Amino acid sequence: MYRRIRDLREDADLTQTQVAGYLGMSKTGYSKYETGENDIPTQVLIALAKFYHTSVDYLLGLTDER
């Protein structure tokens, strides 16, 4: 899951700061999601899925269909 959110961000040519801003959080906090240091709350997963126009199932690795 953590690799997928990083890959989606990089594919969109976005910085961690930009995604963190969308989520209303600090870059440091968001970075900890990408590295797996912190678990990603459900509401953040939903927001990321909407942001990247994908499903929560894709982010969680339950499907490979974006």
Question: What function would you assign to each model-found segment?
Answer:
Residues 24-39:
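Recognition helix of helix-turn-helix/homeodomain-like DNA-binding domains
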Residues 17, 28, 57:
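Key DNA-contact positions within bacterial/archaeal DNA-binding proteins
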Residues 3-22:
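Short basic helix-loop element that most often maps to the first helix and adjoining turn
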Residues 4, 15, 41-44, 55:
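Residues that mark the N-terminal boundary/hinge immediately upstream of a DNA-recognition element
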Residues 35, 53, 64:
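Short, conserved catalytic or interaction motifs in soluble domains
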Residues 24, 43-58:
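DNA major-groove recognition helix of helix-turn-helix/homeodomain DNA-binding modules
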Residues 32, 60-66:
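Short, charged recognition helix plus adjacent turn
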